[in-house]
UniProtKB/Swiss-Prot annotation:
Species for this entry: Homo sapiens (Human)
Protein name: SH2 domain-containing adapter protein B
Keyword hit for NADP: no
One annotated GO molecular function: signaling receptor complex adaptor activity
Biased composition annotated in UniProt, kind: Basic and acidic residues: 233-242, 250-262, 319-334
Length: 509
């Protein structure tokens, strides 16, 4: 007895305590509605579905109204509680399945049209029983409005009004053996002996591939009927025909693909054709190379007489091996500069390039000709214009100290400092020229282009000697001074890193 009390009254144990139960509902209002004789029978499904949409205490009243059994009254209920419940039903009305929703009215109209147009005398009773059963199932589970709509759509005749687009399926007949899931292609096949007795099975056994989302039930029936009329014979082969844009399933036969592969394909075959052409071209080139003689560097130590008999090969091969040795090679020495795969016969472009290089090496350089042409035959200087390429002088010119100053190409005579700077302005660093000094008649000036501008150094004559600046050793002539500092640094402050590299061989016109 103590265990029973502890279990059912939860004495001293808060974990097993049951949740509070809702109060007993009032069924007097539902009894009054059900006992009215003037109420049409078609309104009962609406009332039951409306009751199934409501939650809380209305679920039990829905069940009692649909089943026809009414429980006993628990006592009188005040008008305040009835008004509160009516207001609660209006406030918490389901927007989809409530009594005033447009979707509910549309479903009721479609249900009546479907049951009336079915051609069966008991269509209204079937619809009523189905809706009442669905309403009872929804109320017993205490489902919401969405759950009641889903349960009613499973038994009603118009599924497209109750299911979403992702849940819709074509209304396939019962004779189809397999139902394809969503976004799948299934080849429907029947048993071996079911071709004559079952028209739909025989039609679907013909290898029709269909998708439930792409084609509807009527389209499937039309295809099955057409295939049954075409393939009535039992000995015809199955043909796989794709009914939509999906790819073939893994179990479909590749008869059409194999037949199409045997013929000439109309696809993109240019890479294969190009490869075939290149293979043919390489084969022709190999045939040509076989007809030619063996190149010198391909097999240097093997005999050339491959077609000689075995008796005479032993006597010929030592001589041929000796002739192929490098010391017996009679080719010129420059032939070894080229790699072994560069052959002048096989690569004419490279042969022309090498021939051009040899001609260029054998011919005199244009700089030497230009140096020779700078001096006139009479010993004078060749006048050169300002824009000519010889304006900046000759790079790395060697100065001959035995030549007199007047015949040197870098001597410009009596020109002013400004003219010398104008000539050096167009030249690079370490360019120089020698001119007469403007302050002393017997002295000379060395004008030099540096990275900071122009420098003018005096070549003073002291006791028959010439000195550059103040720290240079004495020289007998000006060409000796220039020749000495072409290979050494200048002893001038600010030009310690400079040498006389580029003489300016330009005369003013």
């Amino acid at each position: 007895m103590a265990k029973w009390l502890n279990k059912y009254f939860s004495l001293g144990n808060s974990k097993t305590k049951s949740p509070p139960q809702p109060p007993r509902p009032d069924y007097r209002e539902q009894r009054r509605r059900g006992e009215r004789p003037s109420q049409p029978p078609q309104a009962v499904p609406q009332a039951s579905s409306a009751a199934s949409a409501s939650c809380g205490p209305a679920t039990a009243s829905c069940f009692s109204a649909s089943s026809g059994s009414l429980p006993d009254d628990s006592g009188s209920t005040s008008d305040l509680i009835r008004a509160y419940r009516a207001q609660k039903e209006r406030d918490f009305e389901d927007p989809y399945n409530g009594p005033g929703s447009s979707l509910r009215k549309l479903r009721a109209m479609c249900r009546l049209d479907y049951c009336g147009g079915s051609g069966e005398p008991g269509g209204v009773q079937r619809a009523f029983s189905a809706s009442s059963a669905s309403g009872a199932a929804g109320c017993c589970c205490a489902s919401s409005g969405a759950g009641a709509a889903a349960s009613s759509s499973s038994s009603s005749g118009s599924p497209h009004l109750y299911r979403s687009s992702s849940e819709r399926r074509p209304a396939t007949p019962a004779e189809v053996r397999y139902i394809s899931p969503k976004h799948r292609l299934i080849k429907v096949e029947s048993a071996a002996g079911g071709g004559a007795g079952d028209p739909l099975g025989g039609a679907c056994a013909g290898g029709r591939t269909w998708s439930p989302t792409a084609c509807g039930g009527k389209k499937l029936l039309n295809k099955c009927a057409a295939s049954a009329a075409e393939e009535s014979g039992a000995g015809k082969k199955d043909k796989v025909t794709i009914a939509d844009d999906y790819s073939d399933p893994f179990d479909a036969k590749n008869d059409l693909k194999s037949k199409a592969g045997k013929g000439e394909s109309a696809g993109y075959m240019e890479p294969y054709e190009a490869q075939r052409i290149m293979t043919e071209f390489q084969r022709q080139e190999s045939v040509r190379s076989q007809h030619k003689g063996i190149q010198l560097y391909d097999t240097p130590y093997e005999p050339e007489g491959q077609s000689v008999d075995s008796d005479s090969e032993s006597t010929v091969s030592p001589r041929l091996r000796e002739s192929k040795l490098p010391q017996d090679d009679d080719r010129p020495a420059d032939e070894y500069d080229q790699p072994w795969e560069w052959n002048r016969v096989t690569i004419p472009a490279l042969a022309a390039q090498f021939n051009g290089n040899e001609k260029r090496q054998s011919s005199p350089s244009p700089s030497r000709d230009r140096r020779r042409q700078l001096r006139a035959p009479g010993g004078g200087f060749k006048p050169i214009k300002h824009g000519s390429p010889e304006f900046c002088g000759i790079l790395g010119e060697r100065v001959d100290p035995a030549v007199p100053l007047e015949k040197q190409i870098w001597y410009h005579g009596a020109i002013s400092r400004g003219d010398a700077e104008n000539l050096l302005r167009l030249c690079k660093e370490c360019s120089y020229l020698v001119r007469n000094s403007q302050t002393s008649k017997h002295d000379y000036s060395l004008s030099l282009r540096s990275n900071q501008g122009f420098m003018h150094m005096k070549l003073a004559k002291t006791k028959e000697k010439y000195v550059l600046g103040q720290n240079s050793p004495p020289f007998d002539s000006v060409p000796e001074v220039i020749h000495y500092y072409t290979t050494r640094k200048l002893p001038i402050k600010g030009a310690e890193h400079l040498s006389l590299l580029y003489p300016v061989a330009v005369r003013t016109l």
